[in-house]
Curated annotation (Swiss-Prot):
Cofactor: Zn(2+)
Assigned EC number: 3.4.24.84
Name of this chain's protein: CAAX prenyl protease 1 homolog
One annotated GO biological process: CAAX-box protein processing
Organism of derivation: Oryza sativa subsp. japonica (Rice)
UniProt keyword terms in alphabetical order: Endoplasmic reticulum, Hydrolase, Membrane, Metal-binding, Metalloprotease, Protease, Transmembrane, Transmembrane helix, Zinc
Top-level class of the enzyme under EC nomenclature: hydrolase
GO cellular component, one term: endoplasmic reticulum membrane
Pfam families associated with the record: Peptidase_M48 (PF01435), Peptidase_M48_N (PF16491)
Cofactor annotation comment: Binds 1 zinc ion per subunit.
A molecular-function term among this protein's GO annotations: metalloendopeptidase activity
Gene that encodes the chain: FACE1
Length: 425
């Protein structure tokens, strides 16, 4: 007797929706609290708190609607076997276009084109509302509708350019991988990730934002001095025009081996009240590098990817699995999609565990910056960024533990103060 794979997947999807909605309700209640957490009283202004509260509540209400629509569409698509219908119709369209639908690569590309069109249509209303209603209402959106459309078109063109060769390579590997399929798939994805990590900041990111060298001055001198003191191989220091799209701020680093680069959002420079606050944020980021957090995270992702491909090889020829989802044939891309659905429970658990590790890394990077003497500046910068980004001040502990990759502000400030107290004692 065939196992009810589809029914099990649908059941877990609904259970996870109920569980995550419960967490969302807890968070919504926390956001409605009319007072600041005690540690933030006197630190965050009342005006910023009210603005943050209003922004967070608007996003929370929007999230409830988006998630409800998403689970309704996803369960409908699976229950009514929409994917097998799309697969069949995409083959017919490919044939009508003069293509050979017997060629799995061509058939798959036609199928994915249909999926992409559907995804764009269903995501567009939510994206427009989020950007031009919620973000605009609270003073964050800086995009015009034409810039929004231009970015969307660029994203679609990149998918059309990069997607087909990647999909074709995966299909060929699966068809010819034999007993070492998991190794070949992982090797390909490992190489692809290295290539994308290399070309994204150099080729792709500049298509959407303008990167300019940080001008000579006190800030540049302090960052270069900090990098040199840590033997960080800083080659280039950029400012990105994030303000053309949003008032949100950030900073990050990238690059391999001796070719490291640091990128500052222009909004970060505008929002921090001193160069030392900005440098403290960079000290935190360099802490991730010095403590090998980036390497550990990359290795963990690669290991999980290899295990995932190993699991896929065990079920890719399961006729019962494909039939449960309504497929008579066993196309490679469909097998991967079905497998992703069957391991949803494991993915949720792993996501939770990775968030735990990520939060631990954030505490360690904060402590690293503090040990360099930037504790006061980092506290001030964290508070400033929390205020300017209107991030949630009150958070439910269950919600933050499950969803947050970064600790809430209260916990980060408390950890920095505890570190100071231990040092004084």
């Amino acid at each position: 007797m065939a196992l009810p794979y589809l029914e099990a997947v649908l059941c877990f999807m609904i259970l996870m929706y109920i569980f995550e909605t419960y967490l969302d309700i807890r968070q919504h209640r926390a956001l409605k609290l009319p007072t600041l957490p005690k540690p933030l009283v006197g630190v965050i202004s009342g005006e910023k708190f009210e603005r943050s509260r209003a922004y967070s509540l608007d996003k929370s209400k929007f999230h409830f609607i988006h998630e409800a629509v998403t689970i309704l569409m996803d369960t409908t698509i699976l229950y009514y076997r929409v994917l097998p219908w799309v697969w069949k119709k995409s083959g017919e369209l490919a044939t009508n276009a003069g293509l050979n639908a017997e060629n799995e690569i061509l058939h798959t590309l036609a199928f994915l084109a249909g999926v992409m069109i559907w995804s764009q249509i269903t995501d567009l209303p939510f994206s427009l509302y989020s950007t031009f209603v919620i973000e605009a209402k609270h003073g964050f959106n800086k995009q015009t509708i034409w810039l929004f459309i231009r970015d969307m078109i660029k994203g679609i063109l990149l998918s059309i350019l990069l997607g087909p060769p990647i999909v074709a390579a995966i299909i060929i590997i699966v068809q010819n991988g034999g007993p070492y399929l998991a190794i070949y798939l992982w090797g390909f994805m490992f190489a692809l990730s290295l290539v994308m990590m290399t070309i994204y900041p150099i080729v792709i990111a500049p298509l959407f934002n303008k990167f300019t060298p940080l001008p000579e001055g006190v800030l540049r001198e302090k960052i270069e001095k900090l990098a040199a003191s840590l033997s960080f191989p800083l080659k280039k220091l950029f400012v990105v025009d994030g303000s053309t799209r949003s008032s949100h701020s950030n900073a990050y680093m990238y690059g391999f081996f001796k070719n490291k680069r640091i990128v500052l959002y222009d909004t970060l420079i505008q929002q921090c009240s001193s160069e030392d606050e900005i440098v403290s944020v960079i000290a935190h980021e360099l802490g991730h590098w010095k403590l090998n957090h980036t390497v550990y995270s990359f290795v963990a992702v690669q290991l999980l990817m290899f295990l995932q491909f190993g699991g896929y090889t065990l079920v890719r020829n399961s006729k019962d699995l494909f039939e449960s989802f309504g497929f008579e044939d066993q196309p490679v891309i469909i097998g991967l999609i079905i497998f992703q659905h069957t391991i949803i429970p494991v993915q949720h658990l792993l996501s939770f565990c990775l968030n735990l590790v990520s939060r631990a890394f954030e505490f360690q990077a904060d402590a690293f910056a503090k040990n360099l003497g930037y504790a006061p500046q980092l506290r001030a910068a964290l508070v400033k960024l929390q205020e300017e980004n209107l991030s949630a001040m009150n958070t439910d502990p269950w919600y933050s533990a499950y969803h947050y990759s970064h600790p809430p502000l209260v916990e980060r400030l408390s950890a920095l103060e505890d570190a100071d107290s231990k040092k004084e004692n």
